[in-house]
A protein has these predicted regions:
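Short Gly/Thr/Asp-enriched flexible loops that form oxyanion-binding sites at enzyme active sites
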Residues: 19-41
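General structural feature for long, well-ordered alpha-helical segments within catalytic domains
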Residues: 3, 22-25, 29, 59-62, ...
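Accessory alpha-helical/coil subdomains and C-terminal extensions
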Residues: 90-154
Length: 157
């Protein structure tokens, strides 16, 4: 978060930011950033469902499309976005709906905000600036150490 805020503060010409992220917790990170980042420039999260060694790896195209969205004037004011499989989702609506296949993310009840294809970014103008409830939250310079316990239901480990 600090890096995002510093990047935007230090470079007024910066169009947007792309963050590559694993897909298991991508929606949670997007949600958190949507609560904390108040800059109107887009922060775009992107991941891949197939490994880079797959014959049809989706990562390179997803990354390219995320960069297209990040520099698009249409993404300005849209808040934090997730770009996967040619679709653009808002951080507050997106969820992972499948663990296999490239169409793993969806915005149930809303659908994607837009899409990206060979012709470019298709994203309607934002009706209003996103509200950011915790934008002024102070981030500590030191975070406490937190233990993480791993547990697998019914597993005999």
């Amino acid at each position: 978060m600090r890096c995002i805020r510093e990047a935007f503060a230090s470079d007024p010409a910066l169009s947007g930011i792309v963050i590559t992220h694993g897909t298991n917790t991508l929606e949670e990170t997007a949600w958190l950033l949507a609560l904390l980042i108040e800059d109107p420039r887009p922060v775009v999260l992107v991941g891949a469902m197939r490994p880079a060694t797959a014959l049809s790896a989706d990562g390179p195209l997803n990354l390219f499309q995320a960069a297209q969205v990040a520099v698009s004037a249409r993404a300005h004011g849209q808040g934090v976005l997730v770009v996967m499989d040619g679709e653009i989702h808002g951080a507050r609506a997106v969820t992972k709906v499948a663990t296999q296949g490239v169409g793993a993310f969806s915005s149930p009840g809303r659908g994607p905000l837009g899409w990206v294809d060979d012709a470019g970014v298709h994203l309607p103008p934002s009706p209003q600036q996103q509200t950011v409830p915790f934008a002024g939250l102070h981030l500590p310079s030191q975070w406490p150490q937190v233990a993480i316990l791993h547990e697998i239901g019914r597993a005999h480990v």
